[in-house]
Amino acid sequence: MDLLHHEKKGFSKGLEPGYVVILSLLTYGMYHIYWFYKNWTELKEALGRPIRPVMRSIGLFIPILNIFLIAQQFKNIRDVAREQGATSFYSHVWTSIAYIILSTAYTVFTVLITVSLIDEGASTLTPDLLVGIMFIDLAFFSLLGILLVAPQRILNEYWSKVQGLPMRQHLTAGEIAWLVFGGLFWFISVIEI
């Protein structure tokens, strides 16, 4: 089975929504950066604006700015899809708020764990604690991935209307690269236990 099918081989730019959650989990949450980048790249023409996807992706790491970038992309996805007659609905406002709150909570959790380990020393990092941290990571990555399902569904409807092609059921080379990269993080986490 060829895992590298994409729109150039007769498939739309859509992505099975479940893949978003799976990719979120398996890439240690890093797939989200690619997801936002890919959508800025693909919607640049549809919006008719001089969007710079790389700069916006870097902006995801800048507090405050990232809030506006995330909210704007969720709104743009909804607006462009509606212009093409998409009937799927999601609240870009509530999706943005939930995504930002969860992302912030995960960042705070990570900082608190790091500060605690620095203060108390690495000897406090027991296998049980590592497993607990990994389960919390899994929970956050799952929830963040689930929040991208609704925007992905409306994107799929948009691409179906615009391109008239079937949705691909395979991963792109970029998605496979993120899986490998994220897999390394999971591997490092597991061998630490």
Model-inferred region functions:
Residues 1-61, 65-113, 144-186:
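Membrane-interface extramembranous regions at the lipid-water interface
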Residues 102-144, 185-193:
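Membrane-helix interface segments in multi-pass membrane proteins
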